[in-house]
């Protein structure tokens, strides 16, 4: 009997340039530290770079989309009220810095090594003073079960909110299932919530997603972003239920096509 060939390891670092382009775009929003971080990276060229980005088709609508997505995860974190937060695939979002600046939260902010190193440097420059909480920026492959559980085990006692936005659309079914298993094991041991702003549906009628902010058509196709979305709301809920979760809260994104929601999930007992 022939064995099924193993899949070649994916190079997830190819996703990282999207985080840089999103930071530039978010510098035109109210998102905490986005403008200051962009200025550290692009210096005086930020206004010109942002102005150029905003000339793209549907730019302002997409800016609202990403700002709303960010704020929806903030709301879910507030409602969850967990003393510990693990954010996975956080990119160049500085939610952890803002939350630990203002609250006694213990926050572990993670992404792939290059992005985590860049963010750690930016955090030091953005807020060199003491924080109300504790912020740790570190590298983590969220699909690595052992590394995931070790990261959670290093958190102080108490329930954990595991948060993500902009991650699931880069993962295929097998990878999403592995991530869900890692989160489920962590929350079974510690209690808490999985908070995801990534419940995206495929574009209606098979229409192509909008290209912009450094995401070329080749980038979108190479990462199979459209294929990685859920086919409908029932399919999305079925995925999480099959992984051992129940949906305890939903925040709908105000959009005429209604293609994204943010969900809070608990381990099904």
Residue ranges and their predicted role:
Residues 1-86, 90-138, 156:
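Rossmann-like AdoMet
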Residues 146-156:
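Short amphipathic alpha-helix with an adjacent loop that forms part of the alpha/beta core around
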Residues 147-148, 170-183:
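A short, conserved alpha-helix within the catalytic core of class I
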Residues 159-175:
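A short SAM/SAH-binding and catalytic strip from SAM-dependent methyltransferases
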Residues 161, 180, 187-202:
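Conserved beta-strand signature within the Rossmann-like core of class I S-adenosyl-L-methionine
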Residues 208-226:
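Short, glycine-/aromatic-enriched active-site segment of Class I SAM-dependent methyltransferases
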Residues 226-244:
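Short alpha-helix
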Residues 253-269:
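Core SAM-dependent methyltransferase catalytic element
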């Amino acid at each position: 009997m022939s064995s099924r060939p193993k899949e070649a390891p994916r190079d997830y670092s190819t996703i990282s340039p999207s985080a840089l382009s999103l930071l530039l775009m978010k510098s035109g929003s109210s998102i905490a530290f986005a403008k200051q971080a962009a200025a550290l990276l692009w210096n005086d060229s930020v206004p010109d770079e942002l102005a150029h980005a905003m000339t793209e088709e549907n730019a302002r609508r997409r800016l609202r989309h990403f700002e709303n997505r960010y704020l929806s995860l903030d709301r879910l974190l507030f409602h969850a009220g967990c003393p510990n937060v693990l954010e996975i695939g956080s990119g160049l979002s500085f939610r952890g810095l803002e939350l630990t600046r203002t609250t006694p939260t213990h926050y572990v902010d993670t992404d792939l090594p290059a992005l985590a190193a860049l963010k750690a440097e930016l955090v030091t420059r953005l807020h060199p003073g003491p924080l109300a909480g504790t912020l740790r920026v570190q590298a983590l492959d969220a699909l690595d079960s052992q590394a995931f559980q070790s990261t959670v085990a290093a958190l102080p006692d108490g329930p954990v909110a595991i948060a993500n936005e902009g991650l699931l659309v880069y993962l295929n079914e097998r990878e999403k299932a592995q991530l869900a298993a890692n989160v489920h094991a962590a929350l079974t041991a510690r209690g808490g919530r999985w908070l995801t702003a990534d419940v995206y549906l495929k574009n209606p009628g098979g229409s192509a997603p909008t290209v912009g902010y450094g995401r070329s058509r080749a980038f979108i196709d190479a990462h199979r972003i459209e294929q990685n979305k859920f086919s409908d709301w029932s399919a999305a809920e079925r995925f999480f239920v099959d992984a051992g979760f129940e949906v305890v809260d939903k925040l709908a994104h105000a959009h005429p096509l209604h293609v994204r929601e943010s969900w809070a999930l608990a381990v099904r007992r």
